[in-house]
Amino acid sequence: MTNKNRATLIGFSAILLWSSLVGTIRIVCENLGAYGGVAVIYSAASVILLLIFGLKTIRHIPKRYLFWGGLLFASYELCFSLSIGFANNGRQAVEVSMLNYLWPTLTILFAIAFNNQKANFLIIPGAILPVIGISWVLGGDQGLNPMMMLANIQDNPLSYALAFIGSLIWASYCMVTVKLADGKNGVALFLIFTAIIMWVQYAFSSEPALSINSFSLILYSFLAAFAIGVGYAAWNYGVFYGNVTILAGASYFIPIISAFLSSILLNLTLTYSFWQGTGLVCFGAMLCWLATRNKKSHLKEIKQ
């Protein structure tokens, strides 16, 4: 196996790790609360990334990237994790996460709008299909049903709003990274910043004192932190040394992989209409990717 293929496989591992996050974060938050659970997870993830990357290159990171990148990164992670933590149940957590997975499509649309990215006609169905897919998912057992979709959103508007806002923020983060990062990686520092914010939120919340009193809870907390910390490290390695085109294409299947792993972790039976909607989200994102594939790409930051 060549070094490039090995690096690509390492990048693939990040996709699997990130896909497990919805299930593991939900389990931890069910036991520790939304604020306390995510604070524990991101603190542990920060330690893992510090062990991998350290902070020795911080002085070389552009200050504008540190500020805007850190602000957007922390905001996204807050929206993503809390949208799962605030969900009423496991099924809703999985449905909410599908809104978050609009970010690949939004990233490409933002690149077209703000980065002069060129695209062909496939961008039109590529932009429309994920919206239809999300509507299909939120329609529940009845599939594409606007009234049921609105009823589901009204049942817990905060979670759905956080997930959608998070997808917008991550697409913006990708644009900021391309313009300001100068090839530097500030993720370890950003995770520390995120963890601090989450502990502050927990301190001002009404959640009870943390009680981690079972091995399974420790295990799921570690798995979530491992998925975040090692996931970022593996992805960066894959992007730098592997086949970026293959990794970018594979990343668009995260919604399907995430839903599958979440259904196992949370013991859920997801309906046929849910899988149809999720498939449309992935297919639309793939069309957006294909619409720009033969053009000079301005996209260098792809995520979970």
What are these regions (language model features)?
Residues 1-39, 145-179, 200, 261, ...:
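Glycine-/small-residue-enriched transmembrane alpha-helix faces in small-molecule transporters
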Residues 54-64, 112-122, 175-186, 239-240:
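Membrane-interface helix-boundary motifs at transmembrane edges
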